[in-house]
């Protein structure tokens, strides 16, 4: 197996490569290209140009650049012979890009080759363990991604690297706020769960609150400041949802998942704790608990992309449908940005 990566940043080094090493007894050969020569993660052989990488007999190509550059790389990849192209979230970064992407994927041949990835779409343990019979059994769902954070010398909150826990040196700017950057994760997990329970693709969302890193409201016309926290509210397949996003939740942060409230009074809580997912079924004073070890990327790559029963193999038509759902989610989140900040 020969894998290719365009963009060799932190997500490749801290998420993809460890998951690949865990999955394969003998790791596959990996090739990569990045416009920054200093980026050379261990286990990846660099190509000097993107064209050189795309000319190789790749089994799967991963597009892991910054989101603003996903589309331009995807266009070149579709012009090559690579048959499986996986694009990191969000698949695009602006509304004009979504229009161009939709035109690009209007061809069934192109659409069948492209999988828009959000690794949280593999977090469907509620479905796998048959804890809910049908979407009609659900009263409401809370989705949440509350990232732990630290403090700088001035006592201001600072983001931490999701994999290492070290301070994130980047200065985050719009559109890299929580609505698009991590809202995609929660929305993908919620929609996939609801879909498998018999729900449809209908969804609505509005911004209840959006604040910057220091807790100040995002002002109309502000096209620079990234949201540090946000509360979104709406519905998915008619089920009321609240989504809570916070990149600066302090030392008590770390909650990552969903909470489902059932009509019979039971509550399902799916969270991330340490190196494992934890699923709980709460019925009054009774609590059942299941633990799912391994990283989310390990499960997603194994179940959807690299395994013998990958989505490309078991249900080729679902590849384009999955991508369509991820595009719908990104489009909605980008539209929320327009409403929050004004047209841009």
Task: State each model region's role.
Residues 220-229, 233-304:
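NAD(P)-dinucleotide binding in Rossmann-like oxidoreductases
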Residues 14, 71, 125, 177-191, ...:
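A structural signal for well-ordered alpha-helical segments within the folded catalytic domains
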Residues 45-86, 90-104, 123:
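Beta-loop-alpha module in the N-terminal Rossmann-like domain of NAD(P)-dependent dehydrogenases
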Residues 164-240, 244-252, 331:
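Rossmann-like dinucleotide-binding domain that binds NAD(P)(H)
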Residues 27, 80-84, 109-112:
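A short helix->loop->beta-strand "cap" motif at the edges of active sites that frequently abuts
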Residues 1-42:
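N-terminal Rossmann-like dinucleotide-binding module
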Residues 60, 91-159:
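A contiguous active-site-proximal alpha/beta segment in oxidoreductase catalytic domains
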Residues 60-62, 198, 209-211, 303-344:
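C-terminal helix-rich "cap/oligomerization" subdomain common to oxidoreductases
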């Amino acid at each position: 197996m020969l894998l290719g990566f365009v963009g060799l940043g932190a997500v490749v080094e801290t998420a993809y490569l460890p998951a690949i090493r865990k999955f394969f007894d003998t790791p596959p050969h990996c090739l990569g290209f990045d416009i920054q020569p200093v980026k050379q993660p261990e286990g990846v052989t660099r190509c000097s140009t993107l064209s050189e990488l795309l000319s190789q007999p790749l089994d799967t190509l991963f597009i892991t650049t910054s989101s603003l550059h996903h589309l331009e790389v995807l266009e070149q990849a579709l012009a090559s012979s690579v048959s499986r192209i996986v694009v990191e979230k969000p698949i695009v970064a602006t509304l004009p890009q979504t229009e161009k992407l939709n035109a690009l994927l209007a061809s069934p041949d192109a659409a069948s080759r492209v999988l828009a990835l959000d690794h949280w779409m593999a977090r469907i343990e509620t479905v796998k363990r048959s804890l809910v019979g049908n979407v009609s059994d659900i009263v409401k769902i809370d989705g949440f991604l509350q990232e732990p954070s630290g403090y700088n010398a001035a006592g201001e909150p600072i983001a931490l690297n999701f994999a290492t826990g070290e301070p994130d040196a980047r200065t985050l700017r719009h559109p890299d706020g929580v609505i698009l950057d991590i809202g995609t994760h929660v929305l993908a997990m919620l929609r996939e769960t609801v879909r498998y329970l018999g729900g449809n693709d209908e969804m609505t969302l509005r911004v209840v609150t959006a604040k910057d890193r220091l807790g100040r409201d995002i002002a109309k016309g502000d096209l620079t400041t990234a949201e540090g926290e946000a509360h979104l509210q709406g519905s998915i397949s008619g089920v009321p949802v609240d989504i809570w996003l916070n990149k600066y939740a302090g030392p008590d942060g770390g909650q990552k998942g969903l909470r489902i409230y059932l009509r019979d009074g039971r509550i399902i809580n799916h969270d991330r704790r340490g190196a494992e997912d934890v699923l709980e079924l709460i019925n009054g004073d009774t609590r059942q608990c299941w633990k799912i070890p391994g990283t989310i990327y390990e499960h997603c790559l194994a179940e959807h992309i690299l395994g013998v029963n990958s989505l490309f193999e078991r249900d080729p038509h679902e590849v384009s449908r999955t991508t369509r759902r991820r595009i719908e989610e990104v489009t909605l989140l980008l539209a929320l940005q327009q409403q929050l900040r004004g047209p841009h």
